[in-house]
């Protein structure tokens, strides 16, 4: 099966909101703690080994990386790799810069159509993960959480983590959050959850095509 994300390439890097590209294509943000396996997940989703780079020193990446997907001449969308957060040894000034960059981007970027939140299945919904959700909540746009590294849990532990996370996310909906909050298990190593993640992201950036696919299946 061909996936849109398999047609991905590096587009640009920015370190300030003023440098965000004046593109019109929909954007999907990828967020997560520095050790949540975000870069690895992006590479597996895009079927590439070195598209997104993980810093050898967690927390050192301070910029936003853009990857275009679809035909090179006419990109369909952009994947936006946000700086990893939560690493204790990062200087305070850098943390403040990240927080301003992340919160402003998530709250004000009109092209942004949804956020993929990467969380280690063994430690989901940390305080900083919740902060990301709360920054994004006012937009009413969807958040889909990937519980990464689920291969490190037993089957029952994975099920328990999934249920507990969904219950916690439901509390945001009950509190009035308008956007969809969904979650799934994901393992880059075992390739668990790849098809589901592909389908969801493509439904965000190409909703008309997704509707056609569902109609074809129904027939």
Swiss-Prot record:
Pfam families tied to this protein: MMR_HSR1
Cofactor(s) in the UniProt record: Mg(2+)
Gene3D superfamilies registered for this protein in UniProt: P-loop containing nucleotide triphosphate hydrolases (3.40.50.300)
Binding site for GTP: 32-39, 59-63, 81-84, 148-151, 185-188
SUPFAM superfamilies xrefs: P-loop containing nucleoside triphosphate hydrolases
Highest taxon of source: Bacteria
UniProt entry keywords in alphabetical sequence: Cell cycle, Cell division, GTP-binding, Magnesium, Metal-binding, Nucleotide-binding, Septation
Any one GO biological process: division septum assembly
Record-listed Mg(2+) binding positions: 39, 61
Annotated GO CC locations: cytosol
Residue stretches making up the EngB-type G domain: 24-207
Molecular functions per Gene Ontology: GTP binding; metal ion binding
Family label: Belongs to the TRAFAC class TrmE-Era-EngA-EngB-Septin-like GTPase superfamily. EngB GTPase family.
Protein's UniProt name: Probable GTP-binding protein EngB
